[in-house]
Amino acid sequence: MPPKFDPNEVKYLYLRAVGGEVGASAALAPKIGPLGLSPKKVGEDIAKATKEFKGIKVTVQLKIQNRQAAASVVPSASSLVITALKEPPRDRKKDKNVKHSGNIQLDEIIEIARQMRDKSFGRTLASVTKEILGTAQSVGCRVDFKNPHDIIEGINAGEIEIPEN
């Protein structure tokens, strides 16, 4: 027999979802059904929480307590870089493996690095910024109209200064 349901217990679930779309409730059902939640309602909550990342795959954290689910987005570096590009959302069914050809300012990259600092293994803001620049290169965008790798080399050589706070 399963243990008694504790109303004060907090459970965390991490799911991958496409921003702004109601996920398939059939995929949610086995994960949240045993916790006493409606998959349809949770799917709508996820769609509401991810609407600013429309069309981009993001990780969603579900905090479940007392049969109430609270959805919050845990953005990855690539999703933050893609939203910083401010491209119009694409149709996922037609366009696959898209290279994003845009330009981002270095200040925006540093701002993304500040957001990702606690999740990163880099000790300094410069090292986290280099991680984000590597992500920008794999996404396919440019930074200050240059290849992101050239900016990484500039940071390593000391030509480009990254603030420490």
Swiss-Prot record:
It appears that the main modified species for L12 contains 6 methyl groups, 2 on Pro-2, 3 on Lys-4 and 1 on Arg-67. Although not reproduced with a second method, methylation at Lys-11 cannot be ruled out. It is found in: Cytoplasm. Its main location: cytoplasm. It comes from the Eukaryota. The modification Phosphoserine is found at S25, S38. GO terms for cellular component: cytosol; cytosolic large ribosomal subunit. The modification N,N-dimethylproline is found at P2. The modification N5-methylarginine is found at R67. Keywords: Cytoplasm, Isopeptide bond, Methylation, Phosphoprotein, Ribonucleoprotein, Ribosomal protein, RNA-binding, Ubl conjugation. The keyword Cell inner membrane does not apply. HAMAP family: Ribosomal_uL11 (MF_00736). Belongs to the universal ribosomal protein uL11 family. Component of the large ribosomal subunit (LSU). Mature yeast ribosomes consist of a small (40S) and a large (60S) subunit. The 40S small subunit contains 1 molecule of ribosomal RNA (18S rRNA) and 33 different proteins (encoded by 57 genes). The large 60S subunit contains 3 rRNA molecules (25S, 5.8S and 5S rRNA) and 46 different proteins (encoded by 81 genes). Component of the ribosome, a large ribonucleoprotein complex responsible for the synthesis of proteins in the cell. The small ribosomal subunit (SSU) binds messenger RNAs (mRNAs) and translates the encoded message by selecting cognate aminoacyl-transfer RNA (tRNA) molecules. The large subunit (LSU) contains the ribosomal catalytic site termed the peptidyl transferase center (PTC), which catalyzes the formation of peptide bonds, thereby polymerizing the amino acids delivered by tRNAs into a polypeptide chain. Present with 68500 molecules/cell in log phase SD medium. This is Large ribosomal subunit protein uL11A. It comes from Saccharomyces cerevisiae (strain ATCC 204508 / S288c). The gene is RPL12A.
